[in-house]
Amino acid sequence: MPRAVSDELPVAAMVLDFGNVSTSVVSQYLILAYDDEYSINYFGQKLRPYWRRNGMQALDLLTAAVNDYANLQKQCEVFDQELIDDITKLGGEKYARVCALAYRQCLAGNKLAADANGQPMLFPKENSSNGCIATVDVIYPMEPFFLFLSPTLVKASLVPVLNYAASDRWKFPFAPHDLGCYPKATGQVYGGGEKTEDGQMPVEESGNMILLIAALAKIEGNAEFASLYWPQLTKWINYLEEKGFDPENQLCTDDFTGHLAHNANLSVKAILSLAAYGYLCEMRGDKINSAKYQKLAKEMAVKWASAADDGVHSRIAFDKPNTWSQKYNLVWDKILNLNVFDPKVTVQEIAYYKKVAIPLGLSYD
């Protein structure tokens, strides 16, 4: 009978005989696998797991893993060492350990499925909240991992959202928050869903999508992917141009804090999104709009520095003196080499963060 996983939780046990203890090395292994015939309900389409895209069955998967075990193990060891070495060179041993944990979380928190043509579609799941699938502000912090290791999977995570946003189902001028509740990607469930703007994240998600698509274009050296969805990007940038600098009483990815009007960090995201759109225009050969949006972003950045100023740091919101918050969205100014904000802004922010950080890290505000 169907039941919850936590109800009479099943336990599997295995006994391996390693023989008598001696100086000789003995090695054995177990294979754990999950045979999901279908992975995701994507708007009525039952998507197969990616490994099944060419007709492979569970027994085939296990057999292939056993037959190629030694080679796969070697590949994993080589990759692990190369990754850790690269990260250690960038930030040291402690930083490498944190990144190793982030690697596991980014990869394990996703389901890789195949569409009808066998193309990859990547669906993250919110594992510590309401189980939303393909949440844009979960994709956003996850994406640098895939930008670094697999731009193909960047596209695989963005395409489901972009296709939904381009459909008749999504009627708003801003980007959606999610596609449903895992494993059903059948329409947004967060906030007002598809019905109202209540509880949405308009500036947050619109900015996220534009910044990520610009980052992908930078990695690939062209804006071909962006061009496939240009009407959606243009719609979102029009919204950000009107609403982004001084956000209304909206939620952002830090929704545990509740609604916050005049959110300074959210404003940073909108400003850099305008510049990122200008960057995409430049790659598409549209010099007029490229100049327009990059100029607009730089003008807003100057206004932002004044509106958010609180002495030796910036405010959490334009109307809240004697406050502060992390301005992590500033990172895209550096990643995309947009040069929108005065470098003094970042220098000042980081200097203050170092003062208020505790051994366990830096709080949000």
Question: Which residue stretches match the model-derived regions?
Answer:
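Acidic/polar, glycine-enriched structural segments that form the non-catalytic walls/loops
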Residues: 1-134, 155, 162-167
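Extended ligand-binding clefts on enzyme/binding-domain cores
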Residues: 126-138, 144-151, 162-165, 170, ...
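Acidic/His metal-coordination segments adjacent to aromatic residues that form catalytic metal sites
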Residues: 116-124, 182-201, 245-264, 308-315
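Aromatic-rich carbohydrate-recognition surfaces in CAZymes
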Residues: 22, 46-73, 131-246, 263-281
